[in-house]
Amino acid sequence: MVKLNVCVLFGGMSPEHAVSLRSAESVLNHMDKEKYNIFPVGITKDGDWILYGSTDYSKLPTGEWLNCPNNRRAAISPIRGQGLLIFEGDCVIREMIEIVFPVLHGENGEDGTIQGLLELAGIPYVGPHVAASAIAMDKTLTKLVADNAGVAQADWLLVRDTEVSNHLQQVIIRLEEKVKSSLHQ
């Protein structure tokens, strides 16, 4: 049986980095090694891509995975047909990836950026496409799309950071009015 090459992306430059590491540990421990060649690629908080050189996934949540002596720098090329690039000394090894499983949370993971890279590279991936990811990440845009589609949802009010900084009292009044009107519907 021919195994499918699967790249599991985890970590990321996001406040959700630690959550992603815990999620990736679970996903990687439950993948069938008889069916898949697994390429676990972690993205550090600084944005470095590292092919994790071990199958001891318990080291992911603790951060110990970063110290594995078999780790190698890696990247997914946006050029179609290049796949996963693994850097070993002066050499670059190409591994064709059949599918990517992004186990990334938050900004730069669920917002369409990784999905856009994978679309450029022509690599299929698990999860929503670029536009759906971007819309879902922006809560205001999600609410506007849901409103436009007639989806029932709780009343909401957009408050921008600058409004809170410059006009806090007016924001409080608007919020109080919104709550009162919601209670009387």
Feature locations, PLM:
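Active-site nucleotide/adenylate-binding loops and adjacent lid/helix of ATP-dependent enzymes
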Residues: V2-F10, S14-P15, L21-R22, D90, ...
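N-terminal phosphate-binding or glycine-rich loops at protein starts, especially the Walker A/P-loop
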Residues: V2-K45, G53
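A short, GP-enriched loop/loop-strand-helix hinge that lies immediately N-terminal to
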Residues: G12, I93-M137, A152-L158
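Hydrophobic residues within alpha-helices
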Residues: S23-V27, I114, T142
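Anion (oxyanion) recognition and catalysis
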Residues: D32, E119, D147
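N-terminal glycine-rich "phosphate-gripper" loop used for MgATP/nucleotide binding
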Residues: I43, W49-E119
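Acidic pyrophosphate-coordinating catalytic loop
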Residues: D48-W49, V164
